[in-house]
Amino acid sequence: MTAFLFDTNPNESIKLGLIVLSSDETIEDEFRAMLPKSCSLFHTRIHSAPEVTPDTLMEMKVGLAASAAMIPHSFNLDVVGYACTSGATMIGPKNVATEVQNVHPNSQVCTPITAVMRALNKLGAKKIGMVTPYIPDVSQEMRNLLIENGFEISALVSFEVSTEAIVARITADAIKRAVRAAAVDGADAVFVSCTNLRTVDVIDELEDELGIAIVTSNQALAWDMLTSAGISTAQSAVPGRLSKT
């Protein structure tokens, strides 16, 4: 067969790129469940240590551009997300954007921590309960960043785990108990951090039970990438009050 038809532009959908940690077992499934069919999702991986510490998180900065480059510039990505809440906190969201835009200069860049702050502001939530899986040094840096950006942290509940393989196996029941413990002192919302925590399926249940917004890393990142690309989350399966605000 020497002649055949082909499309000159086979993919006219919104194109999202996602830089996933090599140790993450969760975010890809949760993203697929949330994104509308009008979006194409392209994944790449970045080397990450199996143990989450301030030093190992900072080490990822040098690999961001190379990881982003595994998705060709010719794909013309609308938005690129760096899928690590703690990594973006330690490296700095602006530094993440600089590294990614060295490769994809015309793409917007989102991180979970900036997405969470935008989501909380969209919800009008200022008094926040936090749930993290991290060791204290990492949780404290994230807490400080939120405070610097005008949020009050009413409670911080952590599993205090440094091993990613364990984080990915924390049960839904354990996460729900932690959220309930953080939803105290008149919190406007609870923020559940980490892209490797399985959270998307518990958001609606917890919001109904507690009567406040639940914002998670994967939910907020999907919402932020979609809205940055001009896609209404009403077209998506992003859960919670966030998608209805």
What do these predicted regions represent?
Residues 215-245:
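C-terminal functional extensions of proteins
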Residues 1-67, 131-168:
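N-terminal glycine-rich anion-binding loop in soluble enzyme alpha/beta folds
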Residues 66-71, 171-184:
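A short, acidic, amphipathic alpha-helical segment used as a generic capping/interface helix at domain edges
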Residues 50, 85-90, 163-169, 198:
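Short, small-residue-enriched loops and turns at beta-alpha junctions
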Residues 78-83, 129-130, 187-194:
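Periplasmic-binding protein-like
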Residues 177-206, 221-222:
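Hydrophobic alpha-helical
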Residues 67-114:
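Glycine/small-residue-rich loop that forms an oxyanion/phosphate-binding "nest" at active or ligand-binding sites
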Residues 97-120, 206-225:
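Short, acidic/small-residue loops that bind anionic groups at enzyme active sites
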